C-alpha cells in the first residue's frame, strides 16, 4: 500500500532489500524495467517492527512467508484479503492485491488534485506505464469524468 508495487514484485522482495534503507531498486517481473523506490520514515519503522516480530531465518529470506516457511501465492493472499473483508464487513467492492495497487494510485492522484496532470505523470512513471492515457484508464479516471458529467446537469 505504500509502494504501488505489483504483488508479484512484493512476493520477490527479501528483507535485506528493504531493511534499514531509504531506497531500494527492483526489476519488475511484468515489465522487466528497473524501478527505484523510496521508503519513508513511517514505513521504515513499520518494516523494522515487522522484522523483529517475524524474526525470519535470514535477512535474505522473503518478506512474505507462511508459517510453513513457504512463499505465499498471489491466490492465497487474495483469499486472505477476502477473509479480512468479510470478517470486518468492509464496504469495498473489490478487495484484492490488484485493487490495493489501484488504491495507491488513486490516493496519489487525489492528494495532488491541485495539479492532476503532474500527478498523472508521476503515476505513469511509478507504474511504468507507457502513456498517461494508460494510467488514466488504469485508475478509472476517464469513466469517472464521464459519469461526473451527469452530476452537473440541471433541468
Question: What name fits each language-model region?
Answer:
Residues 1-2, 109-114:
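Short amphipathic helical patch at the helix-1/turn junction of helix-turn-helix
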Residues 3, 7-8, 12-43:
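Conserved tyrosine-mediated DNA breakage-rejoining catalytic core shared by Y-recombinases
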Residues 5, 56, 90-92, 129, ...:
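Helix N-cap/coil-helix junction residues
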Residues 9-10, 105, 113-129:
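Active-site-proximal segment of tyrosine recombinases
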Residues 11, 106, 135-139:
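Key DNA-contacting residues within the recognition helix of helix-turn-helix
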Residues 28-32, 127-152:
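Catalytic-site neighborhood detector that most strongly recognizes the C-terminal catalytic loop/helix
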Residues 29-49, 60-82:
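C-terminal catalytic core of Y-nucleophile DNA break-rejoin enzymes
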Residues 92-111:
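Short basic/aromatic active-site micro-motif
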Amino acid at each position: 500500500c505504500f509502494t504501488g508495487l505489483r504483488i508479484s514484485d512484493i512476493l520477490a522482495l527479501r528483507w535485506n532489500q528493504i531493511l534499514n534503507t531509504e531506497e531500494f531498486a527492483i526489476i519488475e517481473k511484468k515489465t522487466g524495467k528497473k524501478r527505484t523506490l523510496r521508503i519513508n520514515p513511517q514505513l521504515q519503522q513499520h518494516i523494522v517492527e515487522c522484522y523483529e516480530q517475524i524474526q525470519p531465518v535470514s535477512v535474505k529470506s522473503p518478506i512474505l512467508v507462511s508459517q510453513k516457511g513457504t512463499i505465499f501465492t498471489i491466490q492465497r493472499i487474495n483469499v486472505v484479503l477476502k477473509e479480512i473483508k468479510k470478517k470486518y464487513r468492509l464496504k469495498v467492492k473489490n478487495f484484492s492485491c490488484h485493487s490495493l495497487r489501484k488504491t495507491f494510485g488513486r490516493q496519489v492522484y487525489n492528494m495532488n488534485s491541485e495539479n492532476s496532470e503532474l500527478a498523472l505523470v508521476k503515476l505513469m512513471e511509478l507504474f511504468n506505464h507507457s502513456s498517461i492515457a494508460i494510467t488514466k484508464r488504469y485508475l478509472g479516471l476517464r469513466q469517472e469524468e464521464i459519469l461526473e458529467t451527469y452530476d452537473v446537469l440541471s433541468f
